[in-house]
Amino acid sequence: TQLTGFHHTRGMLCAMKRPKLRDPAALLQDASRVAVLENVMNPTNLGAIFRSAAALGMDAVLLTSAGSDPLYRRAVRVSMGTVFQVPWAYLPEDWTALLHTLGFRTAAMALQDDSVRLDDPRLAAERKLAVVMGTEGDGLADETIAACDFTVRIPMHHGVDSLNVAAASAVAFYALGKV
């Protein structure tokens, strides 16, 4: 517990070198469906998003620098190791311009008056699509929403207006991924 910060019940410990950070432009060359996470802070949510991305056909996960570290032990654990399977990279400040230059259309998951439903056929028809998810609580920045091609909402019942970012990502990846 002195080394890890918590009690191990299974007696296993592994020390690894961090992988070299990937270039997002190179990572996106052959991708058609990617997740963009803007400032997702909770490592549990981050791990769950990686697991959903792996299971539901996303080619990569792209992160802003202010979010949680995918290699944080809780994120790795919740992801069931998929942070080592799904390619990921940190994005530059002008990431929307990078995605657009590489031919991606961007879909901001946000509750706005002009939001289209997740099942809008235009979204699934896009050859290259980035699904953009925001931080817990605050969601996406207004500037991010304005820079995206689509604003998208998940239709819901019983007066519920939003889902946790990990749950919303699973729904969005299922609808828009390569399943």
What do these predicted regions represent?
Residues 1-2, 9, 19-22:
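A short acidic, glycine/proline-enriched capping/turn motif at secondary-structure boundaries
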Residues 1-4, 105:
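N-terminal positively charged helical leader segments and presequences
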Residues 3, 98, 118, 162-166:
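Short, charged, surface-exposed secondary-structure boundary motifs
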Residues 4, 73-75, 101, 117-122, ...:
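Short, well-ordered secondary-structure micro-motifs
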Residues 11-14, 52-56, 67-84, 142-179:
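Structured adenosyl-cofactor binding patch, chiefly the S-adenosyl-L-methionine
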Residues 16-114:
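RNA substrate-binding interface of SAM-dependent RNA methyltransferases
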Residues 108-160:
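Active-site/ligand-binding-proximal alpha/beta "capping" segment
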